[in-house]
Amino acid sequence: MLLEGLHIPLTTPFHPDGRLNLPKLAANVVRYSKSPAAGLVVLGASGEPTLLTDEETRDVLRTVAQSAAPENVLIAGISRDSVRATLALAEFASELFYDAILVGIPSLLVGTIHSESNRNRTELMFYLQTIADRSPLPVVLFSDRDRRIPIDATVELAAHPNILGLLDGAASPSEIEAILRRTATIKREVTVTTVFRAVTARMRIAAGRAPATLVSAASLGASATAAAETPPTPPLRTRTKTIGFQVLAGDTQAILESLRAGATGAASAFAACAPQACYEVFAAWKDDDQPLAEEKQTRLCAAARLAEAGPGNLKYACDLNGYFGGRPRLPLLPPTGSQRAALEQLMKQLRN
């Protein structure tokens, strides 16, 4: 699976009483599907995944799969503390035709990986390798400031044939460059469209379906009855592309520098409230218009810094830009009055 371009980490909408608001989630996804984003990250860190039950997790995964455009790459954030529970959700995501799963450090090991104990690192490696061995979907590793996968571990895991890449919200451009340099020998073939965009599982399914055409009885003769005739299905034209280990940059402040370091795309939390503005950084870089790319990057920074201070801030920024944000689920809190006023001012220049 090709991980290139902008991938939007979704927020999770709730009703005022804390229940999931699935209609608003579906509406957000439909709107994101009309943006230039290449994919959607469901229940990443900004989606409040640890505050959902497994049943709610399934409801969210199902709603997104039913609402997203077939061309959107879908990545399911399904990390659980046990391998067994994670694989159960991986199987569910596979049944919904997701394209990959997002898996990070289990909470049992948070804060211990960088200690002097080799046992904790061994447990992490066993956890991630076992999931990659048994998952029906490819794995994207997840690392951020609170749950950092060590670079050495990332490089070792990159060789696994079922691990596609890394979404890292904390890696500096120099660290991304180091990871890619140390994994440069890894080469894989992926299926892409004729214009080198990702071919998703749901695109393959859609290509196998076509609406029936009604053939009248009159056209068939007096003794015939009307029938539905399925027209030939237009083929999904594809080609192959050779790729290496793929990195999605999760740090909004360093999208451009991360792309320059070799990242294949971006998946920053701020994209949930300003997908067009984030995409414009990637587009200008892709067109090699470096002055424009730097200008687009600079205009993101102040608003992103405040919006990414917590799910409540990010959701309010979504509200300001035409997406449903709403309140976070307790114990998380909405932004203060002063934060709301500051976000209103900062988001003015980033309206879609």
What are these regions (language model features)?
Residues 8, 283, 315-319:
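Generic alpha-helical structural context detector
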Residues 24-31, 59, 63, 284-287, ...:
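A non-catalytic, amphipathic alpha-helix used as a structural packing/dimerization or gating element
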Residues 49-54, 106-122, 190-194, 199, ...:
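Glycine-rich tight-turn/loop motif centered on a GG-T
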Residues 130-134, 145-299, 304-307:
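Catalytic alpha/beta core domains of metabolic enzymes, predominantly
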